[in-house]
Design a protein with these regions (language model features):
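Beta-propeller-forming repeat regions
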Residues: 1-252
Length: 252
């Protein structure tokens, strides 16, 4: 895949060990990118990694994420692409695709859809999906489950006005039992950086913004983990244009 962009380990096929799942950015064969799972062979250095195409219908798939969405003990895949937000899961008939959200819409198809994607838990325990829209986009968005089965998820714009939003994570940063959104942007004039958004309600409609870095981090990517051993999640971000890596220590 000449346009291979993201890869993650996940047992999407229900085997005895995980597969390497890759999402290309642009299609090289057919009308869509090939979201593919590669099985680890007996000898990973010599044997062929058998591929299984999970979906080949979407374009500009900038990221994907894995979790058991429906609680059936099978790992599913969420995708962010030009066509929006989709759930890919294994069924008795093969691989199914369910549209959860359209993402942002624009006259230019390449300015539509979603680019980054993660999931988290709201106050009260409800699941949310968070995205950056469109790819390399200007809007931070949250999706919450609809009341009616089969309907598109409810879309809430959390914040907007950025340039090249490119990093996204969720974690319980303040120990209150619900997840915050950690978001990084790289090209916003004078103030590229890192923000944290704290959910204020169970509906996912109200969020409180906390600026962690304004101007010192042109965020290409970030991860959240406890790096100081105190039980609190910290943030590590890397900046392409600022040529730096920073550790933001959580003191909450």
């Amino acid at each position: 895949e000449r346009w291979l962009h993201r890869m993650r380990w996940a047992n999407v096929m229900g085997k005895d060990r995980p597969q390497l799942v890759i999402s290309p950015l642009n299609a090289t064969v057919g009308n869509g990118v090939r979201l593919t799972a590669f099985e680890i062979p007996a000898d990973p250095t010599k044997d062929r990694w058998a591929p299984t195409i999970l979906n080949g219908e979407m374009n500009r798939m900038h990221n994907h994420w894995h979790l058991d969405v429906d609680g059936d003990a099978v790992i599913d895949t969420l995708t962010a692409s030009r066509e929006g937000v989709h759930l890919i899961r294994r069924t008795t008939a093969g691989w199914g695709k369910t549209k959860l959200g359209s993402g942002i819409t624009a006259d230019d198809p390449n300015q539509s859809g979603a680019g980054e994607i993660k999931t988290g838990r709201l106050k009260g325990g409800g699941m949310f999906i968070t995205t950056v829209e469109p790819m390399h986009g200007h809007s931070l968005v949250v999706y919450t489950a609809p009341d009616k089965k089969g309907a598109l998820w409810n879309r809430h714009v959390v914040d907007e006005g950025f340039r090249r939003g490119h990093a996204l994570w969720t974690a319980d940063m303040d120990g209150d039992g619900s997840d915050e959104i950690v978001f990084g942007h790289s090209d916003t004039p004078e103030v590229p950086g890192v923000n944290i958004y704290n959910g204020l309600d169970e509906s996912g409609e109200k969020w409180e913004k906390h600026v962690i870095d304004a101007g010192g981090m042109a965020t290409e990517d970030l991860v959240v983990a406890d790096l100081t051993g105190d039980g609190r999640p910290d943030i590590v971000a890397g900046g392409r244009a600022t040529h730096n890596v920073k550790l933001y220590v959580n003191t909450k």
